[in-house]
Amino acid sequence: MNSIYILVFSLLWVVVAYFWYGKRVIKRKLIDPVDENPTPSHAMQDGVDFYPAPSIVLFGHHFSSIAGAGPIVGPIVAVTCFGWGPAAIWLLVAGVFIGAVHDYLSLMISVRHQGVSIPDTAEKYVSKKAKFLFLVFVWLTIVLVIAVFGNLAATSMITKPELVIPTFALIPLAMLFGVINKNRWLPLWVNTIIAIAGLIFLIWLGFQFPITIGTKETAYSIWFTLLMVYGFAASVTPVWILLQPRDYISSWVLILGISLAFIGIFIVHPDMNAPFVIAETFKDTSQGPHVPFLFIVIACGAVSGFHSIIASGTTSKQLDREKDAMFVGFGGMLMETVIGIVCVIIAGAAITWGTGENELQWIFKNSGGALGVYGNGFGRLTSFIFGNEVGVVIGITIVNVFIMTTLDTSVRLARFLTNEMIGDKLPAKLQNKFFYTVVAIIPAFLLGITDSWASVWPLFGAANQLVAALVFIILTAYFYSKNKPIRYTLWATVFMLTMTIFALCWMIWKYFVAAPNYFLGSVAVILVVLAVLMIIEGCKKIGSAKKA
């Protein structure tokens, strides 16, 4: 099959889904937004966390934060393990009916509860115990994300020293954009063009003056430490001066990159040469059996629990009007779905399937894994513009820009979660954003600087999808309490819980029997227990509501 057909169908699919399922079904039947309702960004405006943003700027922040490397890595891994057919189908179906619903509803529930996180709302709609369990679990997950993305960013600056200048010089550029935008010294579109031009110049400057420091170990320690310092700054400074503008500017990098990929697909129009389904690995692969691990491997682009924490963390506090949430939340997720489809095409068509040198499996194993596949495939699609080598570098640079946007947002999210989890239990002198950030940064720093994060990372995919499943429990309980139809969230709750628990049980078998690793096996058991406890709490709430 020619890749153009897949891309065109996917684009039509998400456009129809946005206007039909998003606007006509989910928005009208479950939320019914009213612009006259003051959003937290206005009602609780403090100039630091709560501050209204233009919808396009907020879309850029939200989209950059949820994207990261996820919609690139997951689909490419899935193509190599399961085939391009299952990967594309899961992206298109889940992206619309699970992921976009999950993100939009998480955003709106937070907006209607003073901008608190989804785990915090669990106390009201499920139970106090559910809130505590969920907050602790999500906090630990976010700390792990900070460590891992800090590691990825630091490592990328060692392997690609050309990235050092654009990574750090974007900070003052973003701050300048933020000040100009806040004071309205220039129209937004003019400010945007200047900022994008500035970023392109910084990327060019980075390639002219790559920066290296001492040994690999020394460089890693320095870059990782500086990234944690930056994360601290992005967490405590007003959102409009650094976090929001940096993410917004970065979003244009990915949009321009994906646009180039579109052009490449339409001009080169390669045929899909990877298998539609890899039948011989249907029962067992390095990633686990197709069912349920397809639904774990591809998270971003389909459904990701991490998105709900961003939507109810930073995004809900910046939403200007309730009606903007559809564009930001639902639309942002569908944009990620399109990126996932492009990556399926890159892996399944732009690169020849096979184990020979420079073929897909060889590149995946010997040249940077999924990110190496993306860079090489992007280079081949855009070789008629830049040449293959320059195209590869541009592709990898795009990915690295987005690693930073997930890192800085995660630190701020960890601060919010720390406040919600223990803020009211601390002495008054410690109830401040600086202390909350330190509480989150220190364990993340220790995990990253010692590489200890690697010991638990194999379980992150399942843990992330468990977050999504638990969020759907809360959403279902919320709509049940409001006498709204629960069919749009209940089926997703059951599906995500089933697939996630199935995956965790397989991991328990693997780490206790097939390939013993008792630490990982024990963590998997804890996650299953957490899921069961949340199910029990949710059922109790619905049962008590029926009796009442």
Question: Each PLM stretch: what is its role?
Answer:
Residues 50-113, 124-128, 145-159, 324-354, ...:
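Membrane-interface helix-loop-helix modules in multi-pass membrane proteins
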Residues 13-72, 251, 288-289, 293:
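Membrane-interface "cap" regions at the ends of multi-pass membrane proteins
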Residues 23-51, 77, 88, 92, ...:
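Flexible loop linkers connecting adjacent transmembrane helices
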Residues 128-143, 331-338, 389-392, 400, ...:
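Loop-to-transmembrane helix boundary motifs in multi-pass membrane proteins
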Residues 2-19, 78-110, 119, 164-174, ...:
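Extracellular loop-to-transmembrane helix junctions
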Residues 2, 22, 72, 85, ...:
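Transmembrane helix-loop junctions in multi-pass membrane proteins
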Residues 1-16, 196-240, 244, 249-250, ...:
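A generic transmembrane alpha-helix motif of multi-pass inner-membrane proteins
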